[in-house]
């Protein structure tokens, strides 16, 4: 873990970084010398904990050039780099650098949180949504970076419907991962102070009294919707973010709204299993087969072919009922695809 800068200049009210007065960078020459020493000692996996790696483009470019130079000198040496970036600030100089990295090296964590302008205003989040979408599209099409994006459910004023619209907008850009989080109460943040009695209705937030202080209801979503979303997020991790079911997810998410399609499956899966913790890949294969064929009316051969390709590609070795008689005698243990599949 390395840190080229500290602090955050943004004031998102749900985040403890909103309390920072400013952000500042450490001396660039000293930092690069320290990086060189780590690299010389064999370090190849660098996770930058900077809140905003692309805040100062001159510094970002120098750091990226440092790694490009070492990759050119030792192309056989594996390298992994993780950066957290703001999505609406990717000047051409930075894009030119990012485009030079080969697959498997860069992971970019891109916090979206919400595409709803009214919600963004309530939480003091400054984000150009059009530029954000344009830059994400560029990263998908012109870089080899693995894109980990984030959305938060339960922000003040965010309804189930508006969250669904934001999800669909993000999903259409095809990042590798969409992390679905639920708002937590962080003591001392501006949003926590706004949740006290007497605040406007959109800030009528109720949180669990036990850690991690997850929101239970807001002025825009009730307790049942929060519970539904928590289950949905768990299933999304198992199916989409795991990378195990890329082809099957293409079938599942067909329709005008990917979020609505997945929410329908999540509700059905909960009613059918009453389980979120014990769902093995084999149980998920069988559940997807039943749902896609019986509930969605898709052809059995199409569903089976997608599930078979996903299951064999994941390296799993058991025998789900839906694939009995279809599996090869020895399935290759390939694991999760390097770089992940697009969502």
PLM regions and their residue ranges:
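Short linear interaction motif-like sites in intrinsically disordered regions of transcription factors
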Residues: 15, 59, 139, 161, ...
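Radical SAM enzyme core and accessory elements
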Residues: 8, 231-343
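Radical SAM [4Fe-4S] cluster-binding motif and immediate context
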Residues: 1-141
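Generic intrinsically disordered, low-complexity segments enriched for polar/acidic and small residues
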Residues: 11, 36, 50, 64, ...
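Accessory C-terminal segments flanking Radical SAM cores
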Residues: 3, 199, 273-277
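Conserved C-terminal portion of the radical SAM core fold
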Residues: 32-49, 82-84, 102-114, 128-256
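Short amphipathic alpha-helical patches
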Residues: 58-62, 121-125, 193-194, 252-260
């Amino acid at each position: 873990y390395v840190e080229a800068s500290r602090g955050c200049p943004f004031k998102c009210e749900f985040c403890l970084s909103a309390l920072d007065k400013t952000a500042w960078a450490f001396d660039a020459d000293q930092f690069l010398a320290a990086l060189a020493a780590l690299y010389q000692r064999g370090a190849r996996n660098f996770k930058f904990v900077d809140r905003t790696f692309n805040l100062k483009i001159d510094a970002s470019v120098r750091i990226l050039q440092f790694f490009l130079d070492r990759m050119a000198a030792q192309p056989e040496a594996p390298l992994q780099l993780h950066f957290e970036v703001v999505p609406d600030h990717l000047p051409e100089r930075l894009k030119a650098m990012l485009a030079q990295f080969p697959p498997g090296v860069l992971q970019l964590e891109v916090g979206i949180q919400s595409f709803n302008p009214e919600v963004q205003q309530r939480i003091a989040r400054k984000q150009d949504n059009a530029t954000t979408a344009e830059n994400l599209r560029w990263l998908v099409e012109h870089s080899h970076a693995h894109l980990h994006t984030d959305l938060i459910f339960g922000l003040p004023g965010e309804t189930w419907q508006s969250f669904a619209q934001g999800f669909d907008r993000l999903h259409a850009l095809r990042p590798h991962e969409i992390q679905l989080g639920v708002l937590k109460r962080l003591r001392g943040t501006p949003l926590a102070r706004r949740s006290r009695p007497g605040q406007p209705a959109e800030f009528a937030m109720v949180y669990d009294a036990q850690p991690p202080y997850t929101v239970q209801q807001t002025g825009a979503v009730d307790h049942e919707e929060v519970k539904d979303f928590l289950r949905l997020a768990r299933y999304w991790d198992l199916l989409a973010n795991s990378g195990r079911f890329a082809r099957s997810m293409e079938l599942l998410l067909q329709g005008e709204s990917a979020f609505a399609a997945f929410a329908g499956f999540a509700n059905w899966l909960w009613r059918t299993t009453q389980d979120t913790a014990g769902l093995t890949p084999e149980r998920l294969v069988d559940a997807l087969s039943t749902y896609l064929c019986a509930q969605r009316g898709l052809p059995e051969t199409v569903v089976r072919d997608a599930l078979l390709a996903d299951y064999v590609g994941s390296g799993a070795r058991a025998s789900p009922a839906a694939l009995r008689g279809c599996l090869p005698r020895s399935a290759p243990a390939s694991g999760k695809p390097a770089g992940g599949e697009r969502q």
